[in-house]
Swiss-Prot record:
The lineage of its organism: Eukaryota, Viridiplantae, Streptophyta, Embryophyta, Tracheophyta. Residues 255-269 are annotated as: Leucine-zipper. GO terms for molecular function: DNA-binding transcription factor activity; sequence-specific DNA binding. This is Transcription factor LG2. Disulfide bonds: none annotated. Pfam families: bZIP_1, DOG1. Residues 229-249 are annotated as: Basic motif. It comes from Oryza sativa subsp. japonica (Rice).
């Protein structure tokens, strides 16, 4: 009796400390059963389902006495309230006893094993067995009774012991002797805590978590599940599609860059034609080789760059830059001319006649060409007048360079003249009246082709002489003199190109070749006496 009162009092104190639970909820959910004092139990359930009616009635009687004694000790309880409470509790105990008496007895198969209550989780392929509904709530399901072995109890006790809170005592019920003894264990969680725990366990059981998604796949929007292998394939397809889009974007950008470059080349070619670069050629435009066409476009680009460098040189001289800064511009001009010599050397290996005939130059420039370029000695004569004042040592160096250039030019001219004579003799060998039917016609053409191949060697030697002359002149002059030298060369050829443009666009009424009758000497005399500026008054 004393043990029951002590247990009832401790249970009431713990219940008041945690949460005030009404008596009907205590009957619905019961108290928490334990297999041993050190083992934490599952969510609480009604232990009256498996207790005799007499034991239940005795328990409620002891509970009433404990409440009455506790209230008398405090001296704050109204006797009328005690009688009403006792009457209501007696009625509840009688109703519970009648409900238990009406149920059939439960067969105990293993009476020596302890029994604990465990909440059964609902899965897709499992069926709920032995569940009953509570009269207070139709949505709550009573937990099922499950027989467990001592080994399973010991295994689950370690996990449940981590959830215990020290300092709290609950009632422990065993099925062996129906004795009630206090023990230290975790307090009974509330209904909300049980619902949260059940929801968390269901999420873990039914595919919750990233690990299960990676292992078992995921669910699409249409509700169909996708396994992990399909997920990997879909991810690989998305990555391949992304890389394909990047390659396509780069390809489109390449095409756009090429289109812009082609438009620029066409504009440069049109500008070169407007400046008279292709006037009076020895061949039609359709007969021009691909290498020659490429050289013409590159030469037009070179002229544009040359005009920019001439502007920089003129600005540097007018601003009186330091020799260091001005020397950088001079070196760029020297490298720019070296680039032109490289372009000509590449074209000489494929089409040397395009260079020798001067088709790439304007008509006025073509008049002063010597073996496909400028004559070094003539250029030195022009520059000496533009480089004053010169020191005596510089004058000696320039005159020495001029003499060596003239000697090299004479040697190349003699060699080229001999080649022309030899080539003419080869072509004129045999009888010219017989035509292609001559027996040795093909052999003569083969010999002539070998001699024509020597033209490339002569042109390369002439270009090397021009390039070496510029480099030697750069070493003789100072930085400012070299800047004036390159500025004078560029301005000289710019004036020749301008002269060609003026000649190609001269007024047509000044042409004499259209006259049907040639004028006599007396008629030509007044024409020579006319002032020359009247012929180009429009310019």
């Amino acid at each position: 009796m004393v043990q029951g009162e002590e247990s009832s009092w401790r249970m009431a104190a713990s219940t008041h400390h945690e949460r005030a639970i009404p008596l009907n909820q205590a009957l619905a959910y019961g108290v928490q059963a334990h297999a041993s004092p050190s083992v934490a139990a599952a969510p609480p359930a009604s232990f009256l389902d498996f207790q005799p009616a007499a034991a239940a009635a005795a328990y409620f009687g002891e509970l009433e006495e404990a409440l009455i004694h506790g209230a008398n000790a405090g001296g704050v309880v109204d006797p009328g309230m005690i009688r009403a409470d006792v009457h209501s509790k007696s009625a509840a105990a009688a109703a519970t006893a009648g409900y238990l008496a009406a149920r059939p007895p439960t067969l105990e198969i293993f009476p020596s094993w302890p029994m604990r209550q465990q909440q059964q989780l609902h899965s897709g392929n499992s069926q709920s067995v032995g569940s009953t509904t509570d009269s207070s709530s139709a949505q709550n399901t009573m937990p099922q009774m499950e027989l467990v072995s001592p080994a399973s109890i010991r295994a689950s006790s370690e996990h449940q012991h981590q959830q215990q809170q020290p300092g709290q005592e609950v009632m422990m019920v065993t099925t062996d002797d129906y004795s009630y003894k206090p023990g230290l264990a975790a307090a009974s969680p509330s209904f909300q805590q049980q619902h949260q725990l059940q929801h968390h366990q269901q999420q873990q059981l039914h595919g919750g978590g990233d690990h299960d998604k990676r292992k078992h796949g995921s669910t699409r929007k249409d509700g169909k599940s996708v396994d992990a292998k399909t997920e990997r394939r879909l991810a690989q397809n998305r990555e391949a599609a992304r890389k394909s889009r990047l390659r396509k974007k780069a390809y489109v950008q390449n095409l756009e860059t090429s289109r812009v470059r082609l438009q620029q080349i066409e504009q440069e070619l049109q500008r070169a034609r407007s400046q008279g670069l292709f006037l009076g050629g020895c061949r039609a435009a359709g007969d021009m080789s691909s290498g020659a066409a490429m050289f013409d476009m590159e030469y037009a680009r070179w002229l544009d760059d040359d005009s920019k460098r001439l502007t920089d040189l003129r600005g540097g001289l007018q601003a009186h830059l330091l020799d260091t800064n001005l020397g950088l511009i001079v070196e760029e001009c020297m490298q720019h001319y070296d680039e032109l010599f490289q372009l000509k050397a590449a074209l000489a290996r494929s089409d040397v006649f395009h260079l020798l005939t001067g088709t790439w130059a304007t008509p006025a420039e073509r008049c002063f060409l010597w073996m496909g370029g400028f004559r070094p000695s003539d250029l030195l004569k022009i520059l000496i007048q533009q480089l004053d004042p010169l020191t005596e040592q510089q004058m000696l160096g320039i005159y020495s360079l001029q003499q060596s250039s003239e000697q090299a030019e004479e040697a190349l001219a003699q060699g080229l003249q001999q080649l022309h004579q030899s080539l003419a003799d080869t072509v004129a060998a045999g009888t010219l009246n017989d035509g292609p039917g001559v027996p040795n016609y093909m052999s003569l053409m083969a010999i002539a082709l070998d001699k024509l191949a020597s033209l490339e060697s002569f042109y390369q030697q002439a270009d090397n002489l021009r390039q070496q002359t510029l480099h030697q002149l750069r070493r003789i002059l100072t930085t400012r003199q070299a800047a004036r030298c390159f500025l004078s060369i560029g301005e000289y050829y710019r004036r020749l190109r301008a002269l060609s443009n003026l000649w190609s666009s001269r007024p047509r009424e000044n042409f004499i070749g259209t006259e049907s009758v040639s004028p006599t000497g007396t008629e030509l005399q007044p024409m020579h006496n006319q002032p020359q500026q009247n012929q180009y008054s429009g310019f």
